[in-house]
Amino acid sequence: MRKLFTWQAAGLLLMPLLFLSQSISAQPKPVTPPTNGTGTTPTTNGGGSTKPGPKPYKEVITEKAQSRSGLLTVHKVEDKWYFEIGDSLLGRDFLVVNRIAKAPVDLQSGFIGYAGDEIGENVIRFEKGPNNKIFIRTISYSVYAKDSTKPMYKSVMRSSVQPISAAFDIKAFSKDSTGSVIDFTDYINSDNDILFFEGFFKPFLRIGSLQSDKSYILDVKSYPMNTEIKTVKTYSKSSGPTVPGTFFIPPSGNATFELNSSIILLPKNLMHSRYYDDRVAYFTTEFTDFDADPQGVKDISLITRWRLEIKPEDTAKFKRGELVEPIKPIVYYIDPTTPKKWVPYLIQGVNDWQKAFEKAGFKNAIMAKEAPTKEEDSTWSLEDARYSAIVYKPSTVANASGPHVHDPRTGEILESHINWYHNVMRLLRDWYLIQASPSDPAARKAQFDDELMGQLIRLVSSHEVGHTLGLPHNMGASASVPVEKLRDKAWVETNGHTPSIMDYARFNYVAQPEDKISRDGLLMRIGDYDYWSIEWGYKPVLDKTEEQEKAILNEWTKEKVKNPRLRFLHYDGVDPRAQTECLGDNNMKANEYGLKNLKWIIPQLPDWLNEKGENFDNLADVYNEVVGQYNRYMFHAVTYVGGIYTDYKTTEQPGNVYTVVPKALQKEALNFLSKNLFETPYWLLNKNILDKISTPQMDRINSIQDNVMGSLLSTTRLGRMTAEYNRDNVNAYRIDEFVDDLKKSVWSELVTKKPTDAYRRFVQKSFVERMISLINPSNNASGTGGISIVISFGPTVDNKKTDIISVAKGTLRSLLTDIRAAIPATSDKLTRYHLQDVADRIDKTLNPK
């Protein structure tokens, strides 16, 4: 069961770019084959005679040849590169993985363009064609029919012809006639998306056509299961947009890359697959199966996981419940360029998963090692697709990501290159300082000591490794923890503040200084849910087919999900339990504690970040992070309004899948916003800080106020609330009641007769402009003078056919009456002008001329 949603929002930090290497394109782009050198297109000689056929082996692979045996035997003859393809490999599936080995300067675009980045992935087959040809076909597994004895199999095959992406003349046959020799030189030298950049990447990197005269083959090496091609490629480069905050425009010209292409033989013995379950969740490989449903088609999702198999001699031990070592453990190598002081922490972050795999019955199933030196292993290469690695990248990107490469036929994870960007440490410093410094004195300074930073690196390492094991984010894990337990020193230090390291619940910001909670209760760790998810995904179910084990896994899952700590919640922007950067089972209560800590931190920042001889950039950076944290707290509350709980179930499980968030919680969220946002947060406007980091401006607070108002009054949210009330008029929050409560909060001065400050007047105008925009959608409701971001999840709504415009007009009529009644008694001139202005705007909307 899948829930579809749309969203409009800025990207969230540390949200890895997982999807770049999660799936093989179902519609690969065609490659234009070379037209010379390899004889890849038939040619004629004047009188129409065709090119000569294969020559004797020794005439092609001469005594000058430098030969390398392996998966594909490679021969270099002068400036030609010949591939010798055994007949036994024809028709076999190969996975081609392309990476940047060395990147040009000043070309990176966000997360893309660094050494180690994957830039392409394809499944191909070599096959023998007519007229002494070898073809490369690009293979898609988007449709599937397993049983070749059924008529449906033939029908699917007729409608699923795989494209021929390249063709080569057979230059010679192997000495023993069991293989074919082709000239691969021109194909490597060409620009094609089988071996190099997929078209998707080029616009991001601003690169265009290949500069052939500035490109060449560096080397080709072959190993038992893979062949590695290393090239230098130069592309034309267009100038880029101005770099934000500067006058610098990246220049045009050329960009030169060192690229590596790995051609890997996929297993003939397919891994035992496991079907996806929404209640646990893994990354998936998907296809349409025409055999699974006799009365239709069925979309199949298989989880992606490593092939961990029991040694035959250990099967009896496993059945007795003893831990066994897998045939092939999961090994990650640490990039040799990684600063030495961080290597132990990165290794520990990997090894921390060993306990989780013990739940699946395996010991020593996963480990990290330092990459071997040239003296230890001259064949080891970071770009070699046989090896998984944590790749250290000299980047300003404050992030890390954990993609993986998998076999699209079964979901078997083959390798992973975790991207570790150097500047992630700045982000860790900022977040730990603003979330944990009230409890950890070591966080109250500009530069953390190595032990603290190392522990932060360790937890991010574990998080990214989790992605490479197949685990997505479990944003709802922390919602299983009662808020007050986050302040219980003994409990939280034992259990952690979230049961999953795959949650975005960085640090325990609920803990107060007086709680005296140590780092054991502040830092994320691999928790109960992670142990369960690894058990579910990796524990072998012996002597069962994929279909048969589904019933067994279902019984496991039904029992386990009775424990809220073992629950997976999908992030959909509508379920308030599954949000990023939040803690506890009630975000309003948790975030009140978080705000209390921010109020404690703010006045101390100038002292903590006082660096002799330095300017105030560090202070500005951390202050802006405080504002960002405050913004997160506000939007956590917003999600409760019109929120829907989603709990995926199978048909035999009791309870509903979709449940409206109780009205009492929605009202609590609105009260939280009224108190902490719509009433001016003067504590955040610390003059001692602001006078040092910026000219006077109101945008920091105003933009949050306006964006929250826009999200609360979005047609998507109001439309969803209308539908919720129609389904459940007991628990739902009716939109007229909600809008009236919001109006009373924002316009309370009409009753109290108190004067308004500039921030409060802004909020009131924002409310009115948002209401006007519901009536007249063309009205620009942004009141900040800049970009107004409205985050909304769900289907679009036609205002004219719902109660939304009716409620908006009714609210403005009532408000206009109240404003006109208040004007005569208003003594403050600015407040009076403000009320007169707003009254005019409402009147113009309700009574257009």
Model region roles, listed by residue range:
Residues 10-21:
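Bacterial N-terminal signal peptides
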Residues 332-343, 446-452, 488, 616:
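Second-shell loop/turn segments in exported
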Residues 370-393, 455-512:
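The catalytic-center signature of Zn2+-dependent metalloproteases
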Residues 28-338, 356, 360, 371-426, ...:
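Auxiliary tRNA-acceptor-end handling modules of aminoacyl-tRNA synthetases
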Residues 478-849:
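Conserved catalytic/binding loops enriched for acidic/polar residues
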Residues 90, 341-365:
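Zn2+-dependent metallopeptidase catalytic core
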Residues 1-12:
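Bacterial N-terminal signal peptides that target proteins for export
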Residues 20-30:
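Signal peptide processing junction and immediate N-terminal pro/mature segment
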